[in-house]
Amino acid sequence: MLASLSLGLTAALLWGMHDYIVRLVGGRADARAMLLVALVVGAVLLAPISLMAEGWDRFTEFTLGLTALSGFFYALGAYGLYRAFTIGPVRLVAPICGAYPLLSVAFHMARGGEAGLGVWAGVLAVVLGITLVTRGEPGEAQGGRLEAIGWSLLAAFGFALTFGFSQWAAETAPELSVVWVARLFACLTA
């Protein structure tokens, strides 16, 4: 339990740092180039531990298909996130992008999974937390608000489908191999 909590908090911290950096350089760098750099660095860092993981023999064609979909939707979602943060304002786009857990839970339920009150409370806490943190963010849109909303929605749907397909694939193969192969497909997509 403590290991899961530590990993979750570490992931949240790193993802937050990532989003902050994207916001800092978003207006000065090409979104696709930033995405490709992040994907390649992630793939390189994951490679040693993923390739040494056991269970590659359980990686079937079906798993490969799910993993390819996960990688495709991750690249799509991340590109949407980068574009949304470039346009801003953060107080508009972050809550929309951050609402992907709602869609992830819906995907899980569509596959026959259950979501109890605790899951929905967690999702609500995430969305409200993002909204509260970004509420006071200064800045105006660098483009049309509808365009920013569109890219934000693409990010939310992309991330929700990423996690949905990744979790499905991880039911049949080791998580590390699923994440790494999805990252490779995302690199090819970007």
Where are these regions (language model features)?
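C-terminal ends of transmembrane helices
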Residues: 16-29, 75-92, 130-142, 189-190
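Loop-to-transmembrane-helix transition segments
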Residues: 3-11, 37, 47-51, 55-80, ...
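Glycine-/small-residue-enriched transmembrane alpha-helix faces in small-molecule transporters
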Residues: 1-33, 141-177, 182-189
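Structural signature of hydrophobic alpha-helical transmembrane segments
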Residues: 1-14, 55-74, 113-128, 173-186
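Small-residue-mediated transmembrane helix hinge/kink sites in multi-pass secondary transporters
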Residues: 23, 82, 108-109, 167
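Structural motif at transmembrane-helix junctions in multi-pass transporters
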Residues: 27-34, 80-96, 113, 171-178
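Hydrophobic transmembrane alpha-helices of multi-pass small-molecule transport proteins
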Residues: 41, 46, 99, 103-107, ...
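Structural signature of transmembrane alpha-helices in multi-pass secondary transporters
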Residues: 11, 38, 42, 70, ...
